[in-house]
A protein has these predicted regions:
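Bacterial N-terminal signal peptides
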Residues: 11-20
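Mature extracytoplasmic/lumenal regions of exported proteins
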Residues: 89-178
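N-terminal secretory signal peptides that target proteins for export/translocation
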Residues: 1-7
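N-terminal secretory signal peptides
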Residues: 23-102
Length: 178
């Protein structure tokens, strides 16, 4: 009986260590410590017009410097698509959820691939931070997605909170959070 208990105890400890290690990875690449907290206010300072047959509009913001080959962008999105122009009026939205994800946007083929000496070159990756929003006045507005493309060979990462604030300026500001 004591031997079985010892085995069970060590297997439980091992699983706990694995779970703790996986939880620590949540903060890698700007996802944990730099994540905007739920409850942050997103303040839209002027009206934005969504074109017909579109579910969102790009926020005309500020460039964040020359670190990126491609400019970061933010897009305010709505739940429904209309056949006519529609306006999202200046308002205050509350962040109710934050998600970060990345996807392979394109793959750059290397010259050695043709002779089967290499699989492919670096990929172009899209890193996105989605702020899910709530407003009693405009319930159709549901998220603000800030993203950028980066070469996988250049140590890609998510936009920091400071970079998101810069990209949104002067049309949108974030109140609260870091």
């Amino acid at each position: 009986m004591p031997i079985q208990w010892r085995v069970i105890k060590w297997s439980v400890v091992t699983w706990l260590l694995v779970l703790v290690a996986c939880r620590g990875l949540d903060g890698a690449g700007g996802t944990g410590a730099d994540r905007l907290p739920v409850g942050t206010l997103v303040v839209l300072h002027r009206d934005l017009v969504i074109p017909p047959d579109q579910a969102g509009v790009f926020v005309p913001g500020t460039q964040i410097g020359d670190r990126y080959r491609y400019d970061a962008t933010c897009r305010l999105e709505v739940r429904t698509v209309n056949a006519t122009f529609r306006t999202v009026v200046a308002d205050r939205f509350t962040v109710v959820r934050v998600e970060q994800n990345w996807e392979r946007f394109t793959r750059q083929e290397s010259g050695l691939r043709r002779v089967r000496m290499d699989y492919d070159g670096p990929a172009l990756l899209r890193f996105a931070t989605a702020l899910y929003l709530h407003s009693d006045r405009q319930p159709d507005v549901f998220r603000l997605v800030c993203s950028y493309l980066q070469d996988s060979a250049q140590n890609p990462r998510y936009l920091t909170t400071a970079e998101i604030r810069t990209v949104l300026t002067p049309v949108v500001t974030l109140e609260g959070g870091r």
